[in-house]
Structures are given as structure tokens and as C-alpha cells.
């Protein structure tokens, strides 16, 4: 198996409200693959016995057969936004996640994904209209996202 390394114009920065996040160093066109993150897999049993009780639970993706996947690299650094500018696609067979821009990204703009509706923190936009992705499906309905 080979996973390509993406060299995107991105950096990790501290933010005022969200901790660290991923930011663009230059404009990035829409539909650009900005990251391919290998995934560390947790079996269903391992997750149920240990993983769900740790901070790792906040960073894992639902995978096939009850497994949970922890994205490595930038995949674990994208913050949440109810109106994301990045979407992700899982490769179940090869255990990686690809991240793509939904629209053109401006220089110094933070790149964010949607964590869905089951948040473990207070979302500053909680009163805003909600995106309701199927958390089991990495190709959440893009038509529900306003650009």
C-alpha cells in the first residue's frame, strides 16, 4: 500500500477560542486535496473497553465493523465549524482519510471540518442552523452546506 504525501501550503497555529488549528499560507482552490492522513485503528473491543473513556474518543472517526480510526498528521488538527470549508473521505480498505477543500480558501483562513451534531463542547454557533451529516458516512451531504 502506498499513501501519497501532500505538500500543501498549510501551517498549524494557536487560535483564541479553539486551541490549535490548520491555516492556509496562500490561496487554495476549491476541491484541492490538502491532506491524506494515515489512520491508527482501534478494534471494536479495544475502543469499548478503553478508547471511549479517554481523550482519544474526541479525535476518532467511526470506521467499518465497529472500529474507530484515529487520524494522524493534520487529520487530527482540523477544528469544527458548522459551515466547514473542508470535507473528508475515508478509505476503509487502506485505512486513511483524505481531506479536500469545499471552496476556494483565502490566505490565513482556518480550515475546518464538521464534527456533526454530537459535540462534546459548547459550539459558539449552536443557535445557527445545523448540518446533519450521517456520521457513519464520510461523504456527508455536500448539498446541505451553504457556500
From Swiss-Prot:
Record-linked InterPro entries: SET7_MeTrfase, SET_dom, SET_dom_sf
EC class: transferase
Alphabetical list of PROSITE patterns matching this protein: SET (PS50280)
Disruption phenotype: Abnormal sporulation resulting in asci with fewer than four spores and with abnormal spore wall morphology.
Compartments in which it is found: Cytoplasm; Nucleus
A Pfam family assignment: SET
GO cellular component, one term: nucleus
Domain SET: 8-116
Catalytic activity as recorded in UniProt: L-lysyl(37)-[histone H3] + S-adenosyl-L-methionine = N(6)-methyl-L-lysyl(37)-[histone H3] + S-adenosyl-L-homocysteine + H(+); N(6)-methyl-L-lysyl(37)-[histone H3] + S-adenosyl-L-methionine = N(6),N(6)-dimethyl-L-lysyl(37)-[histone H3] + S-adenosyl-L-homocysteine + H(+); N(6),N(6)-dimethyl-L-lysyl(37)-[histone H3] + S-adenosyl-L-methionine = N(6),N(6),N(6)-trimethyl-L-lysyl(37)-[histone H3] + S-adenosyl-L-homocysteine + H(+)
GO molecular function: histone H3K37 methyltransferase activity
Signal peptide: none
Keywords: Cytoplasm, Methyltransferase, Nucleus, S-adenosyl-L-methionine, Sporulation, Transferase
Enzyme nomenclature, EC number: 2.1.1.-
A biological process term (GO) from this entry: sporulation resulting in formation of a cellular spore
Binding partners and assembly: Homodimer.
Function: Histone lysine methyltransferase that specifically mono-, di-, and trimethylates 'Lys-37' of histone H3 to regulate sporulation.
Family note: Belongs to the class V-like SAM-binding methyltransferase superfamily.
Name of the protein: Histone-lysine N-methyltransferase, H3 lysine-37 specific
Organism expressing this protein natively: Schizosaccharomyces pombe (strain 972 / ATCC 24843) (Fission yeast)
